[in-house]
Amino acid sequence: MTFNNKLVDKILEAIFPLPEEFGVILQDDEEIEPVDFSYVQEAVVDADPDADVYFGMSKLVICSPHLGGVVIKIPFNGFYYVDEETGELIWNDFTWATGSDNSDYCLTEFEKYKRLRTYGLDCFVAKTFFYKVKSGVRVFIQEEVSSMNDLYQTRKPSQKSSDLVKKWREEGKVHMDSEWVANCLDKYGKSKVERFLYYCANIDPDILEDVHGGNFGYRKDETPCILDYSNYSD
């Protein structure tokens, strides 16, 4: 995968080192200020004025039209929660990621990608690669994908594929967005989709644990794929 590695390095140089406790608040509470990531946003924009910073529960994602069709993913190493008795913010390290390092969901995602490649099923997920270690933190690069939540409209699948997905859903074989699965059928064929569904059900059943509208979508060439498959769970 080719991308603008000079800009990646410039952005990383701007935001590192990161705080030792790098994560978000697990619970929503109107009286608790959210974790302030403005310093990261400001540093990223200083490096690239067109860049944006997004974050979920397990990772920070940096996007820019100048990165060359990729995003930068940086893992959080834990989270804050609100002590019910004192109301204080308490830090807790991640310990339940399912990869070889149970504190790093980006590494989990990368290892899942490598495993899917060995099964010839990597077309269903965004390409993910380890980039480097920066100040003791692993940094990953992933191909840029538009999530279902960000798309105004998506390609309408064929009626044949839609009917088959409806049948599979009635049989309990499909638990994802029906239109997305039907588009997978149109793009990848019935045999490969059946293999992927079997893989998800029997080989890596937690891969779809956290798949929602923000975690799966379409590449620029309109092929469907999952863009966050690290299996975050609280």
Each PLM stretch: what is its role?
Residues 2-50:
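Juxta-kinase regulatory segment immediately upstream of eukaryotic protein kinase catalytic domains
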Residues 7-14, 43, 164-168, 180-184, ...:
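Charge-rich, solvent-exposed alpha-helical interaction surfaces
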Residues 52, 57-120:
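ATP-binding glycine-rich loop module of kinase domains
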Residues 67-68, 77-80, 133-135, 145-148, ...:
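Short, solvent-exposed loop/turn segments at secondary-structure junctions
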Residues 68-73, 125, 141, 226:
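Short hydrophobic-acidic sequence motifs that mark active-site Asp/Glu residues
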Residues 83-88, 171-172, 229-234:
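Active-site Asp-x-Gly
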Residues 114-191:
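Conserved structural core of kinase catalytic domains
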Residues 199-201, 205-234:
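Catalytic activation segment of kinase domains across protein kinase-like and atypical kinase folds
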